[in-house]
Amino acid sequence: MNPDASFAPIISLAPWFDTPAGAYARAWEQSRLDELTADIFGYNAVQIGLPLFDTLAANRMPNRWITDSRLPSAEISGERQVVVVHDFTELPFATQSLDLVVMPHVLEFSAEPHQVLREVERVFIPEGQVIICGFNPISTWGARQSVGRMTGAHFLPLHGEFISVPRLKDWLKLLNMEINRGHFGCYAPPCATDKWLRRFSFLEKAGNRWWPYLGALYIVQAIKRVQGMRLIGPAWDKKRAVVPSAMPVTNRMKKQRDRHG
């Protein structure tokens, strides 16, 4: 399977984060991600997709990788270095080898979100944790996107199939993963300019207090539970090496140059 083809829609998401609404969303997500990842400990952490984000910036694990479904784009500034390019439905990591996986807007732009989650569950150690970012369909932004699909005037990237938190919770439960923390945020209406987004900034506190589940974005943190197991100390092997089996970016670039040279 060609990973670039199976996840092509996510490419349109990165430029959207350069818009005023995108910058507003990105700032909120980065702040919440820093809070969540700072207190997660272990040895091996991976960010899957959207290298525009630095989701592991506040995390202190010794081994941290970022993977993506495509080669880095020279057209998108600020993208972090991608270590491995692979199909998101086939994670290039050993079974029970990762402590933390962060997926910023991966599931909603995937053709096979269930398979992506199954792969994440496979690579987790017992009590491994996943953090998932998504657009909330039950929000003013979600309503605006639904109208845009009918009128052709889209506010969010066209190809996203946004997943509600209750639905995501059901998917995770089937894989013995339990949501233990979560945040909703970005309560301003779907405005296209900084001026109007700032005018509605007062809604952040009001939204958190009065309608907390109607934020435009959510971030959930879930833990892989293993029945009958209770961890007293680290349950992983410190010497275990996580060796990505997909093709490193540098090798893919070299092969492309050789092919065209």
Show the residue positions of the predicted features:
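A short glycine-rich, Lys/Arg-flanked "PGG" loop and its adjoining helix->strand segment in the class I
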Residues: H114-Q129
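C-terminal lobe and adjacent flexible extensions of AdoMet/dcAdoMet transferase-like proteins
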Residues: F202-G261
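Class I SAM-dependent methyltransferase SAM/SAH-binding core
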Residues: S31, E35-L91
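A short acidic, Gly/Pro-enriched loop at the edge of an enzyme's catalytic core
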Residues: T89-V101
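Conserved catalytic loop of SAM-dependent methyltransferase domains
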Residues: E178-E204, L214
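Class I SAM-dependent methyltransferase Rossmann-like catalytic core
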Residues: M1-D39
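Conserved class I S-adenosyl-L-methionine
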Residues: Q129-H159
